[in-house]
Regions:
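Classical eukaryotic N-terminal signal peptides for Sec-dependent ER targeting/secretion
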Residues: 1-15, 21
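Glycine-rich, proline-tolerant flexible connector loops at the mouths of alpha/beta enzymes
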Residues: 105-118
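Intrinsically disordered, low-complexity segments enriched in Ser/Pro/Gly/Ala and basic residues
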Residues: 1, 17, 78, 310, ...
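Active-site mouth loops of central-metabolism enzymes
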Residues: 71-85, 161-163
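Acidic/polar N-terminal loop/beta-strand segments that form early-domain functional surfaces
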Residues: 42-44, 88, 104-108
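Active-site region of glycoside hydrolase catalytic domains
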Residues: 9, 22-70, 94, 113-115, ...
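Active-site-flanking structural segment that lines cofactor/substrate pockets
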Residues: 78-101
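Short, well-structured secondary-structure segments
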Residues: 99-106, 139-143
Length: 516
């Protein structure tokens, strides 16, 4: 066994049998974090902008997916209408005390056909949004593609299944860097690149809805679950590295910004002390995180992926490996919960396999402190554990937490005490990670507003602010969590020290809403 493999197994065992050092507790505030650390909240273009058919925007693969009836007729055609209400929303961000706002640019709004002329109305909107944020002292953190590929490119050549996407994505990024880079320092190429490849090309639960029998969460009319996730991920990596090379060559010396990639990240722990489960937990990290992190740090896929997927996993040429290796200024994570992992190596004996069968493990949700079924467990070691893993396995690269938040039913409206408990636990856990030396630079809650959620449309809510979809003005109302986060950001301490003040504000907001 190589030294790297020995480390990974030993690290997994250590995380299982001994708790990570904890400094925190309930009493902490923004002032306990470095001044350079950024706290914010986030959104994405398709999920909040609305104005789906206005000012030159053309459909994305998400528009096509939603309009096909995947959510019983629900779409994001209007959603929060952030396209028209951005000034109001930025004012709320400033009042809350946000230091950063993570949002994405709609490729099909800026360049309607995916390539060619820039749409002046789209350009104006994003310039206005960026300037509005900066005028309120809020850093823009921009994602170039939050899974919303222009439908025109999907129709023309199959989108991320074709290497033609590399040139088009790089040209689109060039426009963004040229037009906005004088005011934007933090760029993320792709959101949840690992989940996009899986959901879009293996089990078909998200656009472009590719899968093949016996795999798939819903019927698919096209796809090959055994090969397409790996091909799409390969092209995502090549496109990302091309954009990073462009930025470093053309813009870095004048704009001084940073370009990273975003991954979805569970923290995976062995379900039992059995060696097979310990190895399975490491395999889960290799398949879900190492799939992208290994090429970006080391220049190639994890050995276990090459062994299990075999010829179905594309190979990097020597030049591609050199381009991908080191093509990262930071790695961003969307993290919501810890899972336990158990071995299912028997899946490797099947003749037809997809990504999950190659990974040969099963997820088991952990029991955690939560008050209602369907919500994420408040399992504190998760965030610190995954950051510690990146510190040890990948040399402690700069990290951002781009999404972290609690799911509640939309019917809960303003009384989201479970979200406050969740944020309290995870931000405290984040502080422990910072004090233990993790090179984490920022944290963004998901989400700032209740919006169109990509898993269930308007069935659940993650926002700090409730949006009344039945009101013609789509009125925003602060939840309990918005007041808690605001107090935290303004240095007023933990939930307990500000509880009475928050309860008074929430009661006032609830009464105002009831009388409107």
């Amino acid at each position: 066994m190589s030294p790297a493999k020995q480390f990974r197994c030993i690290f997994t065992v250590m995380m299982l049998v001994s708790p990570v050092l904890v400094f925190g507790g309930d009493d902490f505030s923004r002032t306990d974090f470095p001044d350079t650390f950024v706290f914010g909240s986030g959104s994405s273009a398709y999920q909040v902008e609305g104005a789906a058919f206005e000012d030159g925007r053309t459909p994305t693969i998400w528009d096509t997916f939603a309009h096909a009836g995947e959510y019983g007729g629900a779409t994001a055609d209007v959603s929060c209408d952030a396209y028209h209400k951005y000034k109001e929303d930025v004012k709320l961000m400033a009042d809350t005390g946000l230091e950063g706002y993570r949002f994405s640019i709609s490729w099909s709004r800026l360049i309607p056909n995916g390539r060619g002329p820039v749409n002046p109305k789209g350009l104006q909107y994003y310039n206005n949004l960026i300037d509005e944020l900066l005028s309120h002292g809020i850093e823009p953190h921009i994602t170039l593609c939050h899974s919303d590929l222009p439908q025109a490119l999907e129709d023309e050549y199959g989108g991320w299944m074709s290497r033609k996407i590399i040139d088009d994505f790089t040209a689109y990024a060039d426009v963004c860097f040229k037009e906005f880079g004088d005011r934007v320092l933090h760029w993320t190429t792709l959101n949840e690149a690992n989940v996009f490849a899986l959901g879009g090309y293996d089990n078909g639960f998200s656009p472009p809805n590719h899968c093949s029998p016996p795999f798939g969460f819903r019927p698919c009319s096209i796809g090959n679950s055994s090969t397409e996730p790996y091909i799409a991920a390969h092209n995502l990596l090549l496109a990302h590295s091309a954009v990073v090379r462009l930025y470093r060559r053309k813009y870095k010396t004048t704009q001084h910004g940073f370009v990273g990639l975003n991954l979805f990240a569970f923290w995976s722990l062995p379900y039992t002390n059995k060696t097979t489960d310990i190895i399975a937990a490491q395999r889960a990290n290799d398949f879900y995180l190492g799939w992208f992190a290994n090429p970006l740090i080391f220049g190639d896929y994890p050995d276990v992926m090459k062994r299990n997927a075999g010829s179905r996993l594309p190979k990097f040429t020597r030049q591609e490996s050199a381009h991908v290796k080191g093509a990262i200024d930071f790695i961003a994570l969307n993290h919501y919960m810890t899972v336990h992992v158990t071995d299912s190596s028997s899946s490797l004996e099947t003749d037809i396999r997809d990504f999950s069968a190659d990974a040969a493990f099963q997820f088991i949700l952990t029991d955690g402190a939560t008050t209602q079924p369907g919500m994420y467990p408040v399992t504190e070691p998760g965030l610190q554990g995954v950051l510690e893993y990146f510190k040890q396995a990948y040399g402690n690269p700069p990290m951002y937490i781009h999404e972290n938040g609690q799911m509640t039913p939309r019917t809960a409206i303003l009384n989201d005490t479970t979200r406050v408990d969740y944020l309290q636990a995870y931000i405290g856990n984040l502080l422990d990670a910072v004090r233990n030396g993790s090179n984490v630079k920022g944290y963004f809650t998901w989400s700032f507003l209740d919006c169109f959620e990509l898993l269930d449309a308007y069935g659940s809510a993650f926002g700090l602010y409730y949006v009344d979809l039945d009101d013609k003005n789509l009125q925003r109302y602060p939840k309990f969590s918005a007041h808690w986060y605001s107090n935290f950001l303004k240095g007023k301490g933990s939930k307990h020290s500000a509880l009475l003040e928050i309860e008074d504000k929430v009661l006032h907001s609830s009464q105002s809403r009831s009388s409107s």
